[in-house]
Design a protein with these regions (language model features):
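A glycine- and small-aliphatic-rich helix-loop capping segment at beta-alpha/alpha-beta transitions
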Residues: 32-35, 91-101, 123-125, 146-155
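Solvent-exposed alpha-helices and their adjacent loops that cap or buttress functional pockets
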Residues: 5-10, 72, 94-97, 111, ...
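Active-site-proximal alpha-helical scaffold in enzymes
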Residues: 106-133, 172
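Short beta-strand segments
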Residues: 17, 81-82, 131-137
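Oxyanion-binding "anion nests"
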Residues: 205-233, 237
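Conserved beta-ketoacyl condensing-enzyme motif
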Residues: 16, 50-108, 225-238
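Short, well-ordered amphipathic alpha-helical segments that serve as non-catalytic structural scaffolds
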Residues: 54-70, 118, 203-218
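Condensing-enzyme catalytic core mediating Claisen C-C bond formation in acyl metabolism
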Residues: 1-51, 148-214, 218
C-alpha cells in the first residue's frame, strides 16, 4: 500500500472476494431488480417493524456473502460498515450475536465505498485476510429519521427520490479473485452554499467532481484510464 498525492492510496494485493445484495419489493421492480441476490416481497421482511426489517436485510446480506465462498463469521477479522440510523443502531443489533470486531461508519451515501476503502487499507496493511463490509438503508427508517425527521414536519414532494430498502455486503481479502481493488481516493467536504433542501443532487455533485479531479491528479492519469465511471446521486434529471 502506497500513498499517492494528497488524498489517494494505491493497493498492492486487495481483492473483492465475495458480495451479496438484498432488496425490498420496490427495488425489485426497478431496472436493477434482476441483479439482486434476493428481494423481499414485504417491506417488513417478515419481521414485526421497520428496524427489525433492516436488521434482517443486513444479516441476510452478510451471511450470503460468507456462504458464497464457504466462510463463517469466525473467518472474518473485522466488520466495517454502517447504516443511516442514530448511533448505527441497525448494524450494532445485526452484529451483536456474531462475536466479531466491528468498526462503524456513519457516512450517509458514501458509507458503502468508504467502508470498502477502509477495509482495503486494513487488508493491505496486513491487519487481516478477510474483512467484511456492510451497508444498509430502509425507506421507512431513514426517511422518518435521517432525511425527513418526523419532528421536522417537512413535506416530501412526489418528484423527490426515494431512499432504498436494501443491504449490500462485500468481503475484501488478500486472496486473489476476479475483481482486484487497486486505488482509492478520499474526498473532502465541499459546500456549494445551496439552500434547496429538496435538491440533494446538486449539493453532492461538487464534492464528487472534486474527488474525481483529485484522483486523476494523484495518480497522474487521464479519464480514458477507465472503461466506466459510476456515480450515485440523490437527484433525478428530466
Amino acid at each position: 500500500m502506497i500513498a499517492r498525492g494528497k488524498s489517494s492510496v494505491e493497493f498492492s494485493k486487495v481483492f473483492l472476494r465475495s458480495s451479496a445484495a438484498i432488496s425490498g419489493p420496490k427495488e425489485k421492480k426497478g431496472p436493477l431488480g434482476e441483479f439482486f441476490d434476493y428481494s423481499y416481497d414485504d417491506p417488513y421482511c417478515r419481521t414485526e417493524n421497520w428496524e427489525q426489517a433492516e436488521i434482517q436485510l443486513q444479516k441476510d446480506a452478510m451471511q450470503l456473502a460468507l456462504k458464497k465462498i464457504g466462510l463463517e463469521f469466525t473467518d472474518i477479522r473485522v466488520v466495517v460498515g454502517g447504516d443511516l440510523n442514530n448511533q448505527l443502531a441497525i448494524t450494532n443489533y445485526a452484529l451483536r450475536d456474531f462475536d466479531v470486531p466491528y468498526l462503524g461508519v456513519y457516512s450517509a451515501c458514501s458509507t458503502c465505498t468508504q467502508s470498502i476503502a477502509l477495509a482495503s487499507m486494513l487488508v493491505d496493511s496486513g491487519y487481516g485476510e478477510n474483512i467484511l463490509t456492510i451497508t444498509s438503508s430502509h425507506n421507512s427508517t431513514s426517511e422518518r429519521q435521517f432525511r425527513y425527521p418526523t419532528e421536522y414536519g417537512g413535506q416530501k414532494p412526489n418528484s423527490m427520490t426515494s431512499t432504498a430498502t436494501g443491504a449490500g455486503a462485500a468481503i475484501i481479502s488478500n486472496i486473489p479473485s476476479a475483481i482486484k481493488i487497486t486505488r482509492a481516493t478520499i474526498g473532502k467536504i465541499v459546500d456549494p452554499n445551496l439552500s434547496d433542501t429538496q435538491d440533494m443532487g446538486r449539493t453532492m455533485a461538487p464534492a464528487a467532481a472534486m474527488t474525481l479531479k483529485q484522483h486523476l491528479e494523484d495518480f497522474q492519469i487521464e479519464l480514458d484510464e477507465y472503461d466506466l465511471m459510476a456515480y450515485s446521486k440523490l437527484r433525478i434529471d428530466f
